[in-house]
A protein has these predicted regions:
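Structured binding elements
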Residues: 109
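N-terminal accessory/cap region of cofactor-dependent oxidoreductases and related radical enzymes
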Residues: 1-106
Length: 109
C-alpha cells in the first residue's frame, strides 16, 4: 500500500474524536493538587480549557482593552494540554477563532 493512501479507521472514528475527548476530560476534571480527593471544576461542560477556570485564567485570554468580548488571537487557557495530542490544541484554536468571529458578528448586528 502506498504511504499516502487513505485508510479509514476500522471503527470509523475520526482522529479528532480522541482530541475532543481530551478536551471533555480536561473540562470535567481538575484535581486539587493539595487534596487529590477534590475536583476543582464546575459540574458543567463549559470549555474551561478555552476560557479559563477562574477569573485569573480568564483574564489572561480575554482582550478586555477592546471591550468587544474577544479572545486574544489563537490562545487558550489550559496549560495541561502539553501532554495530550496536538489535535486537542488545534481544536481549541479553531474554537477560539470561531468565538472571535461570532463576537465580531454581534458587534455588527
Amino acid at each position: 500500500m502506498p504511504l499516502h493512501q487513505f485508510q479509514p479507521h476500522p471503527g470509523r472514528n475520526s482522529s479528532l474524536t480522541f482530541a475532543f475527548a481530551s478536551l471533555v476530560i480536561h473540562s470535567l476534571f481538575r484535581t486539587d493538587p493539595s487534596d487529590w480527593s477534590k475536583n476543582n471544576t464546575s459540574s458543567y461542560l463549559d470549555l474551561s480549557p478555552l476560557y479559563g477556570y477562574n477569573q485569573v485564567t480568564q483574564d489572561q485570554v480575554r482582550d478586555k482593552a477592546q471591550g468587544k468580548g474577544l479572545l486574544y488571537p489563537d490562545t487558550f487557557s489550559e496549560e495541561r494540554l502539553g501532554f495530550v495530542p496536538p489535535a486537542a490544541s488545534a481544536l481549541l484554536v479553531i474554537l477560539s477563532r470561531n468565538h472571535n468571529v461570532r463576537s465580531q458578528n454581534f458587534q455588527i448586528s
